[in-house]
C-alpha cells in the first residue's frame, strides 16, 4: 500500500532513481488517454494506480531531474496482492514507472517484473516493455 510520503524505486530508464508519493489519484487509462476521475480522496495506492510523486534521486543526465513533480503508475508493492483464483503475490520493494499525461511511459525500458494487474488496468505499453509479468 502506497500512501503520501512513501518512497518508491523507479523501474524504468527515465533518469529518476527514487520518487516520493505526494498524492494518490483515482485513475486509469480511458478511451482518450489518462483520466484521473477528478482526483478523488483515495488513501492508498495499489498495483496499477496512478500517483503524483516528487523525484528525490535522479541520474545526472536523465530526462527527469531531482525535484520534478511527475505522474507514475505503481508496478510492484511489498503489500500482498490477492487474486481472484485465491493466490497472492508480493514483491520485495515498492516500485513505479514514470508516465506522461497520456499514460505512456517516459522511459524506453522497464526493469524487473511487473504484476499482471497492469494488463487489466490497460497499461499495455508497460506490460510489453517489462521482461517478466507475474
UniProtKB/Swiss-Prot annotation:
UniProt cross-references to SUPFAM superfamilies, sorted A to Z: Ribosomal protein L14 (SSF50193)
PROSITE patterns noted in UniProt: RIBOSOMAL_L14
GO MF term list: large ribosomal subunit rRNA binding; structural constituent of ribosome
Taxonomic superkingdom: Bacteria
Matching SMART domains: Ribosomal_L14
GO biological process: translation
Pfam families from the UniProt entry: Ribosomal_L14
Alphabetical UniProt keywords: Ribonucleoprotein, Ribosomal protein, RNA-binding, rRNA-binding
Keyword Membrane: no
GO cellular component, one term: cytosolic large ribosomal subunit
HAMAP family recorded: Ribosomal_uL14
Alphabetized PANTHER family for the sequence: 50S/60S RIBOSOMAL PROTEIN L14/L23, LARGE RIBOSOMAL SUBUNIT PROTEIN UL14M
Function: Forms part of two intersubunit bridges in the 70S ribosome. Binds to 23S rRNA.
Oligomeric and partner information: In the 70S ribosome, L14 and L19 interact and together make contacts with the 16S rRNA in bridges B5 and B8. Part of the 50S ribosomal subunit. Forms a cluster with proteins L3 and L19.
Family: Belongs to the universal ribosomal protein uL14 family.
Protein name, UniProt field: Large ribosomal subunit protein uL14
Organism: Deinococcus radiodurans (strain ATCC 13939 / DSM 20539 / JCM 16871 / CCUG 27074 / LMG 4051 / NBRC 15346 / NCIMB 9279 / VKM B-1422 / R1)
Amino acid at each position: 500500500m502506497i500512501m503520501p510520503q512513501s518512497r518508491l524505486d523507479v523501474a524504468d530508464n527515465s533518469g529518476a532513481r527514487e520518487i516520493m508519493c505526494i498524492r494518490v489519484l483515482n485513475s486509469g487509462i480511458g478511451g482518450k488517454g489518462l483520466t484521473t476521475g477528478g482526483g478523488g480522496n483515495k488513501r492508498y495506492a495499489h498495483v496499477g494506480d496512478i500517483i503524483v510523486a516528487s523525484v528525490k534521486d535522479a541520474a545526472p543526465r536523465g530526462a527527469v531531474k531531482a525535484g520534478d513533480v511527475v505522474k507514475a503508475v505503481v508496478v510492484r508493492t511489498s503489500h500482498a496482492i490477492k487474486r481472484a483464483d485465491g493466490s497472492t503475490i508480493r514483491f520485495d520493494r515498492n516500485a513505479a514507472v514514470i508516465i506522461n499525461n497520456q499514460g505512456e511511459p517516459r522511459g524506453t525500458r522497464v526493469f524487473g517484473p511487473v504484476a499482471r494487474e497492469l494488463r487489466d488496468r490497460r497499461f499495455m505499453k508497460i506490460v510489453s516493455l517489462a521482461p517478466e509479468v507475474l
